Amino acid sequence: MANTQAMATSFKGELLNAYHNFSATNPARTVNTADSFKAALYLASATVNATTTAYSATGEVTGTNYTAGGITITSWNAPTTSGTTGYTTPTASFTYTTVTLSTAFDAVLVYNNSQGNRAVSVHTFGSQTVTAGTFTLTMPTNAAGTALINIA
């Protein structure tokens, strides 16, 4: 089995039902509070992909100073559009500080922990291990075609 980079198929339908709020300013909701999102790391032997509907500890990394469920994504750039693409990117890199993750991992699941841990997207990268170090996933430029979340 292998992890596959993809936007969760369930996320696409959930957007139409207003489950996910990436912005504190949302005219579609009466309460202007952004949802809380997290980023969990997954083993290279796991299977997270477009069919992943929610966060699960199955296949998630374990190790020193890594908290099950991953890290909280502190904030997102305001969702916007350009041409026919809607997009947003977290405002800061994903940083896992002083961790030891001895088993190879190669994916991060972004999920909405305010809405039943619903999956948003899976992002893959080269297989990694970390020994008493900081692992950082640098965020892409927040623009159409490069943002972490692109809906075309």
Regions picked out by a protein language model, each given a short descriptive name:
Residues 1-106, 113-152:
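Small cysteine-rich, disulfide-bonded extracellular modules of the LU/uPAR three-finger superfamily
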